[in-house]
Structures are given as structure tokens and as C-alpha cells.
């Protein structure tokens, strides 16, 4: 599990494989710039990342990119069995969007 902290009050606990899948999708679809690719490794190596503690412009770009990718992925996934890998992925994406809706 990784901890992605958006601010002092909001933290997204996400399975590492879900974060990797979303992050790679965001990179591949241009929702995250390639210059942000290192943050996937930073989060993986450190058990997460606190967006509060990094450069605000980088934190904003990561939040916007991951939210855009999550929204697109939810549309693509449609209705999936919650007991599958896609179901876990979908539930995690929905939680990301809920936690970061007003950032």
C-alpha cells in the first residue's frame, strides 16, 4: 500500500499495483508529462508521497494529471465486477476522485 497525501487532512491509501497502473496510463496518454515520471518511483520507494511537502507546481501537475487519468479510466472501465483486479482499480480511482475533488 502507498500513502498519497493531498493535504494535511486527505490521504489516499492505494495498492502499489493500482498506483502504478494509473500512473503509467497517465504518462502514456499525456495526462502527466514525462518529466513527472520519476514521482512514480519516489512514491514506490518511500511507501507514498506527501504532495504537501513537494514543489506546489509539481504537486498540482500530479494531482491534475492523476485525476484526469482516473476520470478517463472510469469511463473506459464502465461496469466491472468489484471482485476482480479491474474492480479494485475502479474502487481506488473513485476514492482518488472523491478525496481530491476540490483541489
What is each of the regions a protein language model found here?
Residues 1-103:
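Acidic (Asp/Glu-rich) sequence patches and key acidic residues
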Amino acid at each position: 500500500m502507498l500513502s498519497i497525501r493531498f493535504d494535511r487532512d486527505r490521504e489516499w491509501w492505494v495498492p502499489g499495483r493500482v498506483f502504478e497502473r494509473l500512473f503509467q496510463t497517465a504518462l502514456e496518454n499525456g495526462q502527466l508529462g514525462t518529466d513527472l515520471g520519476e514521482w512514480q518511483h519516489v512514491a514506490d520507494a518511500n511507501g507514498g508521497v506527501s504532495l504537501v511537502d513537494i514543489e506546489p507546481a509539481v504537486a498540482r501537475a500530479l494531482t491534475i494529471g492523476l485525476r484526469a487519468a482516473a476520470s478517463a479510466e472510469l469511463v473506459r472501465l464502465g461496469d466491472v465486477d468489484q471482485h476482480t483486479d479491474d474492480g479494485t482499480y475502479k474502487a481506488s480511482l473513485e476514492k482518488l476522485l472523491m478525496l481530491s475533488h476540490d483541489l
